Design a protein with these regions (language model features):
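Polybasic, lysine-enriched low-complexity intrinsically disordered terminal tails
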Residues: 1-23
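A conserved regulatory-domain signal marking ACT and ACT-like small-molecule sensing domains
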Residues: 33, 329-448
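N-terminal Rossmann-fold NAD(P) dinucleotide-binding loop
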Residues: 39-40
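NAD(P)-binding Rossmann-fold cofactor-contacting core
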Residues: 49-72
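Rossmann-fold NAD(P) dinucleotide-binding segment
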Residues: 86-124
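Rossmann-fold NAD(P)-binding glycine/threonine-rich loop
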Residues: 108-113, 117, 126-164
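Rossmann-like NAD(P)H-binding beta-loop-alpha module
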Residues: 141-144, 148-221, 228
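Substrate-binding/catalytic subdomain of NAD(P)-dependent oxidoreductase enzymes
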Residues: 189-190, 198-296, 301-303
Length: 448
C-alpha cells in the first residue's frame, strides 16, 4: 500500500499541476519545519491569500504545546497536525517540505530523507545552501523532485529568481551589494552620529540582531549569502570558509565624518568577481561613493547590483529582514513548485577564492602626535609600493590622542597590511589602524 501511494505521488510531481483554482485536483500537501518568526508568517500568508490548491497539513516544532497555544497559531488550519517527531512528517504523504529552522544538523539529514522519499523542498536556510546546496540539488534531481531556496538571500527581494530567470541569458561578471539587513541598519544609524554599541543594542531590542551578533557583524551571514549568489550568478562553487571577512564592529562614528569629506558613506559590502580560474570574493565594511545606488540603501534594506557582460548593471532592492518579506519569498517558491516549475540546474565549477581586490584604501590612525609621524607612514607605504592619495585631519582633537586619515591610490590589501604591520610597532600608535577598502564605481578587481 505504501509503495503504491509513493509511486503515485512521484508520478504527480513530474507533471505540471493545474492552476491552484481548479478544485477537482487534489490539494498540494505542505509541511512546515519550524514555526518561529518566518514560519508563522508563512502560515499567515497562506491563510490570508487565496491558495485553495495548497493545504498546510503538518507543522514540526520542538515545543508544540507552547506554539499551539500562541496567538500566531490562529492562522494554522484546525486540521493541521502539530508534532515534535520529524518522522511523522517524513513518513507522511506530504508533497512539499518547507524548512525554516536553520543550521546544518540535523536539518540536512532530514531534508535528504524527505527528498529520497519523493518530497520537494523549499528552504530559507542560507548556511545549508551555502555549504550543502550543491549536494542537495544533485540529490533532488536524482529523485525527480525540486529544491527551491529563493528566500535564503535578501528575504523578500527576488534576487535569486531574478538571476535564474531574468539574467540567465547574460554572462554575469560581477556582483556586489548589501545582503545583511542587520549591518545595514547599524551602519546607516551610525551615519547620523550614533555610536556602534548604542545602535547594536537598539537592533537587538528591535529583533534585528541576535543576542550574539557575531554572525551578522563579523560577516559570516553575508558570506554564506555571497556564496549562494556566486553559485547562481558566476557559476562558481565557493568554500564559504575561504571567503575573506572583516567585522563592522571596529568602525566608529568619526569614520562616517571622514567618509562624508570623501563624498562617501560606509556599508557592509559583499562582492565577488571571476578572474580566470579565481574568484575574488570578500565581505566587509567599505567606503561607498555617494554616486553609487548602494550608498542610499538605509535601515534593513538589501541591495544587490549584478553586472552582466551584455546587459550591464541590474539592481535588486527591497527589505531583506523580517518575517513577512521572507515569508513572501518562501510562498513564491512554494507556488512555483506546486505549479510544476523546475528548479534550474546551472553548470557550476569549483573555484579557488582570493580576498584580494585592487582598490583605494582608507586608513584611520589614532596617534600621540609627534614630529615625523606622517613622514613615517608615507615611508612605510612607499616601501611596499603604495602611494598616498590624500591626508585628512579634523580639528578639535587633542594632540595626545589625535585621529587622522590617509587614503591611498589603488593597491592590494595585502600590500597595505605589510605597511601597517611595521607601523603598528611605533610607540606613538595608540590603536591598531583601521583599514577599509574603498569601492569604486568602475571597480576592476580582476587586475589584482
Amino acid at each position: 500500500m505504501a509503495t503504491k501511494k509513493q509511486s503515485a505521488k512521484k508520478s504527480a510531481q513530474t507533471k505540471p499541476r493545474p492552476a491552484a483554482g481548479k478544485q477537482s485536483e487534489p490539494a498540494v500537501k505542505v509541511a512546515l519545519l519550524g514555526f518561529g518568526t518566518v514560519g508563522s508568517s508563512v502560515a499567515t500568508v497562506l491563510a490570508g491569500s487565496k491558495f485553495p490548491g495548497i493545504q498546510l497539513t503538518h507543522i514540526f516544532n520542538r515545543n508544540v504545546a507552547r506554539k499551539v497555544s500562541s496567538p500566531v497559531a490562529k492562522s494554522v488550519p484546525a486540521s493541521a497536525v502539530w508534532t515534535d517527531d520529524i518522522n511523522v512528517i517524513l513518513n507522511s504523504d506530504v508533497d512539499i517540505v518547507i524548512e525554516l529552522m536553520g543550521g546544518l544538523n540535523p536539518v540536512e539529514g532530514w531534508l535528504r530523507k524527505a527528498i529520497v522519499s519523493g518530497k520537494s523542498v523549499v528552504t530559507a536556510n542560507k548556511q545549508l545552501i551555502a555549504y550543502r546546496g550543491a549536494g542537495l540539488a544533485k540529490l533532488a534531481a536524482q529523485h525527480n523532485v525540486h529544491l527551491f531556496h529563493g528566500a535564503a538571500v535578501a528575504g523578500g527581494v527576488p534576487v535569486i529568481p531574478g538571476m535564474l530567470q531574468g539574467l540567465c541569458g547574460d554572462q554575469v561578471t560581477r556582483l556586489s551589494g548589501i545582503v545583511n539587513g542587520t549591518c545595514n541598519y547599524i551602519l546607516s544609524r551610525m551615519e547620523t552620529g550614533a555610536n556602534y554599541a548604542t545602535v547594536l543594542a537598539d537592533a537587538q531590542q528591535l529583533g534585528y540582531a541576535e543576542a550574539d551578533p557575531s554572525a551578522d557583524v563579523d560577516g559570516y551571514d553575508a558570506r554564506a549569502k555571497l556564496c549562494i549568489l556566486s553559485r547562481i550568478a558566476l557559476h562558481a562553487e565557493l568554500d564559504p570558509d575561504a571567503v575573506s571577512t572583516q567585522t563592522i564592529s571596529t568602525v566608529e562614528a568619526i569614520d562616517f565624518s571622514y567618509a562624508k569629506e570623501l563624498n562617501c558613506t560606509i556599508r557592509q559590502i559583499s562582492r565577488a568577481q571571476v578572474n580566470g580560474g579565481l574568484v575574488h570574493a570578500r565581505v566587509g565594511p567599505m567606503l561607498v561613493p555617494l554616486a553609487s545606488p548602494i550608498a542610499w540603501s538605509h535601515g534593513t534594506q538589501n541591495m544587490v547590483v549584478v553586472s552582466g557582460r551584455f546587459g550591464g548593471d541590474v539592481v535588486f532592492s527591497g527589505h531583506g529582514a523580517g518575517g513577512a518579506p521572507t515569508a513572501v519569498a518562501v510562498v513564491s517558491d512554494l507556488l512555483a513548485v506546486a505549479q510544476g516549475c523546475k528548479s534550474v540546474q546551472l553548470p557550476v565549477r569549483k573555484r579557488k577564492v582570493t580576498g584580494e581586490f585592487l582598490a583605494p584604501h582608507y586608513l584611520r590612525f589614532v596617534v600621540d602626535d609627534k614630529p615625523g609621524i606622517v613622514s613615517a607612514i608615507a615611508g612605510a607605504l612607499a616601501k611596499v609600493g603604495a602611494n598616498i592619495d590624500s591626508i585628512l585631519q579634523r580639528p578639535g582633537y587633542p594632540k595626545h590622542r589625535l585621529p587622522f586619515v590617509v587614503t591611498t591610490e589603488p593597491c592590494l590589501t595585502s600590500t597595505i597590511e605589510q605597511a601597517l604591520a611595521s607601523l603598528a610597532k611605533m610607540d606613538c600608535m595608540l590603536e591598531r589602524p583601521l583599514c577599509l577598502q574603498m569601492l569604486q564605481i568602475e571597480d576592476k578587481p580582476d587586475e589584482a
